[in-house]
């Protein structure tokens, strides 16, 4: 299991984070897939809470609102407690991220689009396999 700390979250070569440019409102901010760039390190603070995790991006905890993932600037008590499950068959640091209803994070088809929250597809193998758009690399920063 992951310990509380600073992490990067990727899907394949793309970075998962809030947009660098956002409106100034207090509305929930979209969590999106971004092109890889070495100019920025978009750090997540992952807080372990029992068997679940609060995922904070740029100071704001995340939640699913309907079928997408957002960062909450206000009403942060509404943050989702996520379960993060290792999927070692997909490599080191490979995980799926799920809510309590069994749905989970799914990367969109292209960079710039928002992380989707929906029922996960599980391959009928032992151990199970997952489509790569459901597998996220969570890398601890020292």
Curated annotation (Swiss-Prot):
InterPro entries on file: Inhibitor_I66
Acetylation is among the record's keywords: yes
Keywords linked to the UniProt accession: Acetylation, Protease inhibitor, Serine protease inhibitor
Record-listed N-acetylserine modification sites: 1
Gene Ontology molecular-function annotations: serine-type endopeptidase inhibitor activity
A family per Pfam: Inhibitor_I66
pH dependence: Inactive at pH 2.0, activity is restored after 10 minutes incubation at pH 8.0.
Entry function: Serine protease inhibitor. Active against beta-trypsin and alpha-chymotrypsin with dissociation constants of 0.35 nM and 40 nM respectively. Inhibits factor XIa, but not other enzymes involved in coagulation and fibrinolysis. Does not inhibit subtilisin, lysyl endopeptidase, arginyl endopeptidase or papain.
Entry protein name: Serine protease inhibitor
Species, as recorded: Lentinula edodes (Shiitake mushroom)
Taxonomic path: Eukaryota, Fungi, Dikarya, Basidiomycota, Agaricomycotina
């Amino acid at each position: 299991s992951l310990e509380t700390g600073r992490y990067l979250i990727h899907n394949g070569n793309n970075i998962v984070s809030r947009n660098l440019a956002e409106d100034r409102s207090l509305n929930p901010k979209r969590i999106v897939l971004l092109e890889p760039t070495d100019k920025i390190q978009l750090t997540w603070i992952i807080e372990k809470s029992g068997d679940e995790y609060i995922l904070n991006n740029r100071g704001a905890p995340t939640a699913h609102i309907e079928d997408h993932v957002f960062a909450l600037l206000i009403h942060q008590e509404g943050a989702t407690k996520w379960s993060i499950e290792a999927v070692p068959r997909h490599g080191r640091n490979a995980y799926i991220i799920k809510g309590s209803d069994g749905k989970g994070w799914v990367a969109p088809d292209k960079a710039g689009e928002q992380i989707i929250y929906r029922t996960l597809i599980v391959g009928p193998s032992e151990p199970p396999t997952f489509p790569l758009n459901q597998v996220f690399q969570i890398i601890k920063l020292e």
